[in-house]
């Protein structure tokens, strides 16, 4: 049963001819009013297919809303709280990428979508945690500059013969850095029958203990397709909420404290105000958007 605030949002969404996109880490009440929920890759693909809407309300962090604009420069892209920034996306600047290219002129540059538009514009192609290995394998170059998440870079290196150089050396997601091998061992001892699903932004010693290393979208598919009845979820805590909307199987957060405070800045009240006032508008300068779009679209072609 939707509450009054949720019903108000659905009414406003119809009046404004808007669509609401939400990342899997959003709260239950926001996931319940979203037109589409997904991981970074799924949201990129969905954003590239939007037709017949004037406004896109993006319940995610800054780089996600920027990507929606890059793919839809003719639409008004709104983010309910403009303070919703991804710390990892701010760990790699466009200048950092240019300097790395000068140092390794024969390398391809693969950037995680978790980067700001200015950095994306310097990339040859983008990737997400769902398609990173496939993207790297699609390249002719044997040397790949990969950033900004060093743990995802490690994961890719484990699954390719190419040489992966992380840029910067210590880029990371603060939420996934919370998980330790000790947390995993304790959870497996407490829930021995549960499958352990781990995100590739986790540290290598955590990944090595996983039953499956998956993006959040991959985690949802695994739960739906597996014969197992319980799962330990090694990513942001509200991924268990996302799964619960699709499945009655038992999901246990690896850490209850694994909360992305940046994602949680969005609330129903802010979504409502975003629609009423058409705020906060997200744009990207034309030349940066053009160059970044090329890298985004190349990724989407590899993924489809």
Swiss-Prot record:
Stretches of the chain forming a coiled coil according to its record: none
Catalyzed reaction equations: iminosuccinate + dihydroxyacetone phosphate = quinolinate + phosphate + 2 H2O + H(+)
Biological processes annotated in GO: 'de novo' NAD biosynthetic process from L-aspartate
Needed co-factor(s): [4Fe-4S] cluster
Upper taxonomic lineage: Archaea, Methanobacteriati, Methanobacteriota, Methanomada group, Methanobacteria
GO terms for MF: 4 iron, 4 sulfur cluster binding; metal ion binding; quinolinate synthetase A activity
Cofactor note: Binds 1 [4Fe-4S] cluster per subunit.
Protein name: Quinolinate synthase
Entry's family note: Belongs to the quinolinate synthase family. Type 2 subfamily.
Annotated binding of iminosuccinate, by residue: 23, 40, 112-114, 129, 199-201, 216
Binding of [4Fe-4S] cluster, residues: 86, 173, 260
Organism: Methanothermobacter thermautotrophicus (strain ATCC 29096 / DSM 1053 / JCM 10044 / NBRC 100330 / Delta H)
Encoding gene (name): nadA
């Amino acid at each position: 049963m939707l509450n009054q605030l949720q019903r108000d949002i659905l009414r406003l969404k119809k009046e404004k001819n808007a669509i609401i996109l939400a990342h899997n880490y959003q709260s239950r009440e926001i996931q319940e009013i979203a037109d589409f929920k997904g991981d970074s890759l799924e949201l990129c693909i969905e954003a590239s297919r939007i037709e017949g809407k004037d406004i896109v309300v993006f319940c995610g962090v800054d780089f996600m809303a920027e990507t929606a604009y890059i793919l839809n420069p003719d639409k008004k892209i709104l983010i309910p709280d403009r303070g919703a920034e991804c710390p990892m996306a701010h760990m790699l600047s466009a200048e950092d990428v240019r300097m790395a290219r000068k140092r390794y002129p024969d390398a391809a540059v693969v950037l995680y979508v978790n980067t700001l538009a200015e950095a994306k514009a310097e990339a040859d192609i983008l990737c997400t945690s769902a398609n990173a290995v496939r993207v790297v394998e699609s390249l002719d170059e044997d040397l790949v500059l990969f950033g900004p998440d060093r743990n995802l870079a490690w994961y890719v290196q484990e699954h390719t013969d190419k040489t992966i150089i992380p840029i910067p050396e210590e880029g990371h997601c603060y939420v996934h850095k919370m998980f330790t091998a000790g947390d995993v061992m304790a959870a497996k001892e407490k829930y021995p029958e549960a499958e352990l699903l781990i995100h590739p932004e986790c540290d290598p010693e955590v990944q090595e203990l996983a039953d499956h290393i998956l993006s959040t979208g991959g985690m949802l598919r695994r739960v739906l397709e597996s014969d197992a009845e319980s799962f330990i979820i090694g990513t942001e805590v509200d991924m268990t909420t996302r799964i619960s909307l699709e499945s009655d199987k038992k999901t246990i957060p690896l850490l209850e404290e694994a909360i992305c405070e940046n994602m949680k800045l969005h609330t129903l009240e802010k979504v409502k105000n975003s629609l009423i006032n058409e705020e906060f508008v997200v744009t990207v300068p034309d030349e940066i958007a053009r160059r970044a779009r090329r890298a985004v679209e190349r990724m989407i072609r590899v993924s489809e």
